[in-house]
């Protein structure tokens, strides 16, 4: 329909369209992007606020394959958007959000969009915010493991990086371990020593275990994702995270405090979509205590009272 309107409308004609259809907008963008002016109306209580969206921003989005084939245009017709890392995150968080709203007599006006990983979150958030859409973002805790990605996400929400850089560096420095990599020269020297000193043609179990111990790596980041913020070292790192987390929450970035989605319900093993289905099948009653932790988190994200 949008294509038909755009192709038949003459240069000296105008058309005023009231719509909740993303397909009409997409059709118009396909054939006459320069002629479109989108007026978005948001209602809060008894008041309407009106904003005219920037044509240049629409052109940028439409010329970007990543954004063009996402459901960003659907966001125009929702009160707010939640950006998550994966489709399974979206499914579980939306189920909980709908339930919380239903319990207090409200309807959900939130669209959940999965970004296909942390590395795409900043770009999608920036695009949505440029269209005057209310955006919140839910990354896993290990987003802190990559400064470039984390900085991009923070700055896409207009966070002054310098205001949180010190706290971020304190956290990162406390989580990097000397055992995250294996020193090849040290390993070679140790193996050579064991082989040269051994009088037997075969290595003993003790010698094998010594070599295995040297090969073993330890990552505090992995522990952080499995166990959440409780795995942060006590003291400076914990205080720094609390300060930084508050800054992020104030602008709409809610880091998963337990590490990742699956850590909210540890009674069920697995990962991804299968895990979500298994949880909902095993615990069909959303008022079950097993959901208390995730409901508390989503209530904070949505500013709802439990």
Question: Which functions belong to the PLM regions below?
Answer:
Residues 1-71, 285-288, 292-293, 299-306:
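Switch/communication elements of ASCE P-loop NTPase nucleotide-binding domains
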